[in-house]
């Protein structure tokens, strides 16, 4: 049996903003990437991993997506993307998209609706919790970007969870309607012809229902959310569902960013018989200083 194509592929990451500027405005763009395909082909690469090009307020360099099916105007148009895809494929180069579905931008229409009222149809697309009696955050979790992982929204006087910036509310993967919309969006890109996805923070999409205070490390103000958000109880269920609904229908390369995951756990995401992802970015082996605790995952 022939190995999957991606097992022998050479992947080259392109960060569009700084790669090649075709129109002289000082910002790299999709036309710039297309103009350098011959150069990339000469390098001998097989795959371009394209960092986020979706519409975004750019709070986190495009990892805060406000429209999953639109191109950030400073990078060009959807026609520019289609031309890049066509020209890359003509040269035997595949395109893998960066995909961010642990969270969205707070300017995404889902969140704009979600925050309007407690009974809004999109309310449960995100993770909301009541304040404590004194009005403080539901627990002591800290954000990866500093400060609390909770943001009070005055519209309904409830907090929403954001493991990253306050402008990046976490999506509620427990909601099947949210998952349906994510799979529909992924299918749209696959039908367009993309060759896979690199999935940002995919090990964090399943949070535990119980959200107690996290352990506070010496010298830190906030608690560790890891035991309650990384490798949550349904993460493999969701990825198997994603595989069945979308990934298995196409010839794709899928890479999961799995920070906080042990080598043993990583094999569950990308094992031959896991029916989840092709491979993962696994970080434990580069934690030379031993500053990250993985004990809760063993």
Language-model segments: residues:
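Acidic/aromatic-lined carbohydrate-recognition and catalytic surfaces
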Residues: 2-187, 191, 204-261
């Amino acid at each position: 049996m022939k190995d999957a194509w991606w097992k022998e592929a050479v992947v080259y990451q392109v960060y569009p903003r700084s790669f090649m500027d075709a129109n002289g405005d000082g910002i790299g763009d999709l036309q710039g990437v297309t103009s350098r395909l011959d150069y990339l082909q000469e390098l001998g690469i097989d795959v371009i991993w394209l960092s986020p090009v979706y519409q975004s307020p750019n709070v986190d360099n495009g990892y805060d997506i406000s429209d999953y099916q639109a191109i950030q105007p400073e990078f060009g148009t959807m026609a520019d993307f289609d031309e890049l895809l066509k020209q890359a494929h003509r040269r035997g180069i595949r395109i893998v998209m960066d995909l961010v579905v642990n969270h969205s931008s707070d300017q995404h229409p889902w969140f704009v609706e979600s925050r309007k009222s407690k009974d809004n149809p999109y309310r449960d697309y995100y993770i909301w919790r009541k304040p404590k009696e004194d009005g403080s955050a539901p627990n002591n979790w800290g954000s990866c970007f500093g400060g609390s992982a909770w943001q009070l929204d005055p519209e309904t006087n409830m907090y929403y969870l954001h493991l990253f910036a306050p402008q990046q509310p976490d999506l509620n993967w427990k909601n099947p309607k949210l998952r349906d919309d994510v799979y529909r969006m992924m299918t749209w890109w696959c039908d367009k012809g993309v060759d896979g996805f690199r999935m940002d923070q995919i090990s964090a999409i399943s949070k535990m229902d119980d959200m107690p205070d996290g352990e506070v490390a010496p010298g830190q103000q906030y608690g560790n959310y890891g035991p309650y958000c990384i490798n949550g109880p349904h993460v493999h269920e969701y990825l198997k569902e994603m595989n069945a609904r979308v990934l298995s229908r196409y010839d794709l390369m899928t890479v999961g960013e799995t920070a906080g995951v042990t080598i043993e756990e990583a094999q569950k995401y990308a094992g031959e018989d896991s029916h989840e992802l092709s491979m993962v970015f696994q970080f434990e082996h580069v934690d030379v200083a031993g500053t990250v605790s993985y004990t809760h995952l063993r």
